[in-house]
């Protein structure tokens, strides 16, 4: 949803500003929306939480363990089920009537049903946190330290002469690259991860940066 800076501010004051954040997991998205919702007049809706609560899990770690890695038995079926759950949870989140909703979407929101993506484009000001080159390696390491549910969408393959772990680390940057264009097509504004993850950047500066330029 394209907005002018004046429209952004007017909607915020009226309580009708709808913002959604998109981007890869482990890039500071959830931390940033939490900071914004704490400092400003936003109601935070976490789609991840809606999903794992629906599955009866009590944490993201439990959800990640359930989904597993793409080389584990039954992953394709769990991936398809996960996308179905994400579609339903995202649709529910976007349909909220709360004041100034700020929706923290899943990293795989781009694979949800078309009607959900249309809701995002039509009804929400979409902020994309782009993973910059300096953070790609960190994302790979962090993914294995704390694996979040991740839809591979056919981008994983077992590489000749590589272990499963080595293969997934090789394929992960390709997955990030394939997703980048899809996130960008949804976005109304893009913020670099170098800004989001810089501890010297105050939340006020991030809030001003995500507003329309004019």
Give residue ranges: language-model regions.
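NTP-dependent small-molecule kinase module
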Residues: 1-15, 35, 39, 166, ...
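The Walker A (P-loop) glycine that initiates the GxxxxGKT/S ATP-binding motif of P-loop NTPases
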Residues: 23
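ATP-dependent small-molecule kinase phosphotransfer cores
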Residues: 49-118
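Pre-Walker A (Motif I) flank of P-loop NTPase domains
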Residues: 14-19, 98-99
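Post-Walker A helix-loop "phosphate-sensing" segment adjacent to the P-loop in P-loop NTPases
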Residues: 38-47
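Walker A (P-loop) phosphate-binding loop of P-loop NTPases
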Residues: 26
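Walker A/P-loop
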Residues: 30
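A glycine- and Lys/Arg-enriched "phosphate-lid" helix/loop adjacent to the NTP-binding pocket
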Residues: 122-179
């Amino acid at each position: 949803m394209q907005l002018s800076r004046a429209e952004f501010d007017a909607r915020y004051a009226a309580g009708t500003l709808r913002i959604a954040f998109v981007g890869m997991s482990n890039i500071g998205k959830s931390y940033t929306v939490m900071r914004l919702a704490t400092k400003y007049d936003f109601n935070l809706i976490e789609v991840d939480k809606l999903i794992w609560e629906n599955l009866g899990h009590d944490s993201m770690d439990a959800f990640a363990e359930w989904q597993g890695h793409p080389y584990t038995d039954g992953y394709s079926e769990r991936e398809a089920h996960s996308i179905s759950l994400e579609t339903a949870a995202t649709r529910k989140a976007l349909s909220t009537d709360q004041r100034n909703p700020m929706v923290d979407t899943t990293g795989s929101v781009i694979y949800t049903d078309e009607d959900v993506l249309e809701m995002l484009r039509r009804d929400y000001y979409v902020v994309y946190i782009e993973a910059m080159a300096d953070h790609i390696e960190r994302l790979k390491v962090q993914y294995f330290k704390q694996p979040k549910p991740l839809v591979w969408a056919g981008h994983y393959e077992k590489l000749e002469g590589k272990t499963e772990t080595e293969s997934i680390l090789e394929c992960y940057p390709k997955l990030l690259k394939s997703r980048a264009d899809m996130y960008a097509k949804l976005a109304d504004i893009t913020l670099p991860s170098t800004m989001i993850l810089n501890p010297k950047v105050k939340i006020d500066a991030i809030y001003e940066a995500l507003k329309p330029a004019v």
